[in-house]
Amino acid sequence: MKKPIVLVIMDGVGRGDGGPGDAVKQANTPTLDKLMATCPMTWLKAHGTAVGLPTDDDMGNSEVGHNALGCGQIYSQGAKLVQESIETGSLYQSKTWVELTDNCLQNGKALHFIGLLSDGNVHSNISHLIAMLKKAREMGLKKVYCHILLDGRDVPATSALEYVDQLEAVLASLSDAEHEYKIASGGGRMVITMDRYEANWPMVEMGWRTHVQGEGRQFASAKEAIETYRAENPGMIDQDLLPFVIAKDGQPVAKIANGDSVILFNFRGDRAQEISLAFDRKDFDHFDRGDYTGVKFAGMLEYDGDLKIPMHYLVEPPVIRNTLTEVLCKAGVHEYAVSETQKYGHVTYFWNGNRSGKVDESLEDYAEVPSDVIPFEQAPAMKSVEITDLLVEAMASHKYQFLRCNYPNGDMVGHTGVLSAVITAMEAVDTGLARVKEAADKYGYTLLVTADHGNADQMLETKKGKTSVRTAHSLNPVPFIIYDPDNKYEIKDGHYGLANVAPTIVTMMGLETPDCWQPSMI
């Protein structure tokens, strides 16, 4: 066995443009700067197809990032995952689907679907909606309604009627005297419901009024609404179409009533989170929800694992096999993992392929530092000192051949949008990194430094000439650094992603990499 290895994951730290919104560059980080200037290093792709997401417009996140880091493979996430769960039927066996449909069957409640109506496959796919509608009819659900968001962004700009006609044909085939399957409301995706990054809560509120309260301009059908708006507003494209409510005799066909079941069928998270919060959270305060007391709500996927948005979802993340931990346990390698509460699940559960518990109790030790319960911008160092204390202590014990830690600061403070706090957060991470490097020298470790996705590196964004605070992840690559003065490692030329980290670790240890893994970088 070669030297033991310690891996530091700086959560939310990518390569920015060096401008005023790049908190990584703005911060005083002498240790990170020196490592990057003097050590073998490369930049890893940490978003989109490199982490199993459908397109390279999809930002990475901590969950898929740690999946890729910990398994050396690229697993389907998002659209592919939903498609597979519909094909195998596992979606309909999920506790959440059963709960929502039972609520309708036993309590006479309606089932509502909300989502983007197209086959763009970026946020949603109409085929997923149609499959669930057919299943609901097969199960005998009597009242099922669709609240449709028109696309024109991931598909041709004025293609809405193709999808509406397709959906109406399906709904007609499922309806009879006993069963009502109808479109109830809708509007353009850039006008209602699908805001992101908390940029425009009134847009979400307009969606709420339209779908839930049935308020708005009434039409006999979605087709009539679309054709009317196009005639009144020449040149208007689908994403900008105004809200509409389908009505009969002056009354909405269906409002979303308290106690109903609601499924948000978008699988991409960024534009699904705010409406999810409006349905899910008792303490919601971004707008007045009227007499709302609650529904049984589920998203297609978990849109944010850190913030638990939504509370319930239909499709579980993938169960990943042949993880790094499995390979190391087979080889008898002792492992140590540490973070604070905010990312503890990421260096354990997500790292181990979405599996709770340990692969081998006798070989793995985990440590969790309880996170602060105050807003992170108020204490941007978070628990970096305590994490470092535990990691250095574990290194000094010489018990472990592979240790990993996650500093959440760049991501969790990054999400607050408070630039000065993010700069302080980065400096705290660098202070921790300096101590880990010192321990690596003292106790004879190879030190690896990387991240799971960007965030702190892009705190500002400019749209239509206006610069505003950005709180979302970036699409920027993340560093991968090897610090080991005793071994002159060379990183091979190539385009690498997060899934190349595990094979590199195994290669350094002189172990065999599984055939299904990505290649090592050395």
Regions found by a protein language model. Give the residues of each.
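Feature captures the catalytic ectodomains and active-site-proximal regions of enzymes
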Residues: 1-522
